Amino acid sequence: MKENSEEGQLYLTEAHLNYILSIYEISKNTVDVSSCSIARELGVSKPSVSTMLSALMARHLLVKERYGKVYLTDAGYATAMRLERNIKKLEEKIPLMGISFTDDEIRKLARMIAVTLSEDDRDV
């Protein structure tokens, strides 16, 4: 795990951010987010989800209850909201590039860009 040397915080990778966004998006439709629903959303295995959830819990971005329900902490929710704001801004800017994209393609591209930006550039 890399540390952000200036702040002593653990670095968040693209994968971490994709999981946080997926948990946030699932939680919009249901109160109880499960490992299975995360695996389905991301198209990954349950063991992969378990490994990532442990990493996110170590970063205090989520909690997992005894019976498997997953919830974002305040810090996890704040991270998801920041990413969501950046995605919305990118969704507005991408069409200005003059390339024809469908709404779904714009959303996917905006998400990909938002999670790929360096830690310093994550606020678009």
Protein language model regions, located:
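N-terminal helix-turn-helix DNA-binding core of bacterial DNA-binding proteins
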Residues: 3-44
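Residue-level signal for threonine
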Residues: 13, 72-75, 118
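Conserved catalytic core of two-component sensor histidine kinases
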Residues: 50
